[in-house]
């Protein structure tokens, strides 16, 4: 049975320095009274989806936060804010940036009506505030959210059978939640941002197009692109 008073922070790790900094931020988050936290690094994962599945199965936490090793969670009240959103049991997943309607390509950032906010620190001493539209209320439902941070209150298997690498696993998971009738939402961050993302420039994997084909083959009939 899931432990309603526990949150697990799950990260696939191949850079110990980045993960050490990320966990430093996680350990400084405020936890509501009675809540506990666990930190689950996954090393040597065959893919993001496979790593997340392994950690998901190993934890009894009701609330699981899947985040990249280069994501710094700076909102000290993140857990409180997350629990407030999850009071709505129709909300299955929370991200920080995403789009209301996926385009025909399945690539969320090419979609229309993108919502959310994240600070990007791609170079030393250079921070860009990537602020998109903000929800009018506390949060807004989206069709897809970015995998830099995805938090869940229900366990649904990540599709490691379709995505053997590091792309499309996140958009796929959003649609897996939708298939089961759950909302994926992005919170209002107008007053303050939740995350700093520190990605390093790297080329797309050669298999990217193949994973995209897998995505469209599996979920193409769910897409209704806006024009």
Model-derived segments and spans:
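Short acidic donor-binding/metal-coordinating loop in glycosyltransferase active sites
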Residues: 67-71, 154
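C-terminal catalytic/acceptor-binding lobe
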Residues: 161-227
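Conserved donor NDP-sugar-binding/catalytic core segment of glycosyltransferases
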Residues: 72, 77-115
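A recurrent flexible, glycine/aromatic-enriched loop bordering the glycosyltransferase active site
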Residues: 126-152
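Glycine-rich, basic loop-to-helix element that forms the pyrophosphate-binding segment
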Residues: 45-59
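A conserved hydrophobic helix/loop-capping motif in glycosyltransferases and polysaccharide synthases
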Residues: 6-18
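Short aromatic/hydrophobic "clamp" motif used to bind/position activated sugar donors
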Residues: 64
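Short, well-formed alpha-helical segments that are part of the catalytic scaffolds
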Residues: 16-32
């Amino acid at each position: 049975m899931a432990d309603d008073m526990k949150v697990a922070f799950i990260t696939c790790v191949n850079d110990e320095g980045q993960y050490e900094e990320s966990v430093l931020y996680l350990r400084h988050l405020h936890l509501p009274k009675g809540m506990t936290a666990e930190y689950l690094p996954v090393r040597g994962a065959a893919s993001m989806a496979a790593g997340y599945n392994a950690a998901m199965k190993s934890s009894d936490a009701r609330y699981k936060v899947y985040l990249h090793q280069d994501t710094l969670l700076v909102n000290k009240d993140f857990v409180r804010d997350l629990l407030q959103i999850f009071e709505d049991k129709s909300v299955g997943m929370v991200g920080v940036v995403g789009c209301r309607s996926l385009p025909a390509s399945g690539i969320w950032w090419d979609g229309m009506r993108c919502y959310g906010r994240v600070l990007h620190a791609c170079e030393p001493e250079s921070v860009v505030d990537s602020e998109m539209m903000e929800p009018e209320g506390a949060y807004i439902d989206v069709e897809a959210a970015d995998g830099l941070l995805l938090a869940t209150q229900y366990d649904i298997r990540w599709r490691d059978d379709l995505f053997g690498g590091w792309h499309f696993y996140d958009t796929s998971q959003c649609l897996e939640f939708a298939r089961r009738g759950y909302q994926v939402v992005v919170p209002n961050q107008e007053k303050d941002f939740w995350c700093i993302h520190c990605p390093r420039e790297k080329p797309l994997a050669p298999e990217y197009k193949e994973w995209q084909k897998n995505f469209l083959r599996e979920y193409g009939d769910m897409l209704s692109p806006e024009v």
